[in-house]
Amino acid sequence: MLPISYTNLNSSRITRDGTASSASRYRRLIPEYFRRIFHYPQMDIEYTFWIMFYLCFNPSRVYRVTSWHKQTKNQWARDDPAFAVILVFFMAIASMSYAITFHFLSFLNVIKVMFWAVFVDFITVGLLIATIGWWVTNKFLRVSVHNHSVDQSVEWLYAFDIHCNSFFPLFIILYVVQFFLLPILLSNSLFAAILSNTLYIIGFSYYYYVTFLGYNALPFLQHTVVFLYPIGILFALYIVSVVMGKNLTVSIINFYFGFQL
């Protein structure tokens, strides 16, 4: 019989236990959503493109699927980061296209435009909007809970999902459609100003509409119509901008690229 070293056995057990405990701590500290960002095979790309398609043409259908997700995964939020990852990729390509179009050709300038579009416009603003939506809904819009009812609340990640869903149609309108209409939108005419401002009011109104649908899909929230109120403000600003002859496309391009068109 071979001699057994209990010291080695114990150290081996400690190593295995330590590795297991480290892995469990890692899983607790980093949610599955963020871990899967680095595991492309775990992302459901086909389902993500299905969501993107219907967000543009029938967004209410997307949120009907949300209730099924709650029943199967016991959470409202997506556990798959594919949507955010693909949207970031699309935004990087679009912002790089704008940089090339306006002769922002140096490497640092291209990175600057991509960084601003992805990490400021989409991620930073999105984190802020999601946090505000999460706080407002949980603080003011939840239905009163009865004694024997389960207390439910809006998940922060679901609020961020809503932002991602709402941002995609806005991206299509204000990044993609606007890009192909630039020869018209940048002309010095009243028609160009009206067309440009119409694109912006459609894009942002659609953003708030999809946001409303997202929160309205939660059965424990009430008065979610408040998420449609900003559309009225947008319409008033639209009228003012048209009367003043303000072209929002020109203003945005001047802001991003630092020159006067």
UniProtKB/Swiss-Prot annotation:
Keyword field: Membrane, Transmembrane, Transmembrane helix
Keyword set includes Transmembrane: yes
Membrane-protein topology: Multi-pass membrane protein
A Gene Ontology cellular-component term: Golgi membrane
Compartment annotation: Membrane
Alphabetized Pfam families for the sequence: UNC-50
Chief localisation class: membrane
Claim: Transmembrane helix is one of the keywords in the record: yes
Membrane-crossing residue ranges in chain numbering: 37-57, 82-102, 113-133, 166-186, 190-210, 225-245
Coiled coil: none
PANTHER family registered for this protein in UniProt: PROTEIN UNC-50 HOMOLOG
Family, per entry: Belongs to the unc-50 family.
Protein name: Protein unc-50 homolog
